[in-house]
């Protein structure tokens, strides 16, 4: 099965989560979080990074509804909330690895292309080339899309 609307929403949320990490890295470089007490810095960083992904997740739910692919709202909302948490966590890890917003910006196109090619957004490449579905497991959209198989 392929999921064009659902797949595009998944990739869009992933891109926005990565964008949130880029913006948060830039805010860190400018010293935005330095005036905060130490106990508030990490929660504020996470909130700053998560805000775009959460807003896009809500818009993604509306796109699923408008596209006529929403199954049941509670199930969709729970799946999207879990997926949003996975996207934020993976963006946080990539931010720790890359450290600079410029480096993170440079890897976003590769992650997007990988998500579109190896996850069943338009074509399930794993059906035609065994093993490619295993590569899809490297990308968060793959897990979200598997919840609706």
Where on the chain are the PLM-derived regions?
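Transmembrane alpha-helix boundary/anchor motif
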Residues: 8, 12-20, 61, 85, ...
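Alpha-helical transmembrane segments and their short interhelical loops
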Residues: 39-116
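Membrane-spanning helices that line or support transport/gating and their immediate boundary helices
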Residues: 20-32, 89, 93-96, 127, ...
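Hydrophobic alpha-helical transmembrane segments of multi-pass membrane proteins
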Residues: 9, 21, 50, 77-81, ...
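Transmembrane helix-loop junction
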Residues: 26, 64-68, 95-96, 120, ...
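Hydrophobic alpha-helical transmembrane segments of multi-pass membrane transport proteins
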Residues: 2-67
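Transmembrane helix segments
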Residues: 101-138, 142
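Short, membrane-exposed interhelical loops at transmembrane-helix boundaries
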Residues: 141-149
């Amino acid at each position: 099965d392929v999921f064009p609307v659902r797949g595009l929403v998944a990739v869009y949320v992933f891109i926005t989560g990565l964008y949130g990490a880029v913006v948060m890295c830039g805010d860190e470089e400018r010293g935005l979080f330095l005036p905060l007490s130490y106990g508030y810095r990490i929660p504020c960083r996470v909130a700053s990074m998560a805000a775009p992904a959460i807003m896009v997740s809500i818009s993604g739910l509306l796109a699923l509804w408008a596209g006529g692919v929403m199954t049941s709202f509670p199930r969709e909302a729970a799946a999207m909330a879990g997926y949003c948490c996975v996207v934020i966590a993976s963006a946080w890890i990539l931010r720790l690895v890359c450290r600079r917003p410029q480096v993170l910006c440079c890897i976003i196109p590769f992650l997007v292309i990988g998500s579109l090619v190896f996850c069943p957004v338009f074509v399930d490449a794993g059906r035609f080339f065994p093993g490619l579905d295993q590569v899809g497991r490297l990308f968060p959209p793959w897990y979200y899309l598997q919840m609706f198989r």
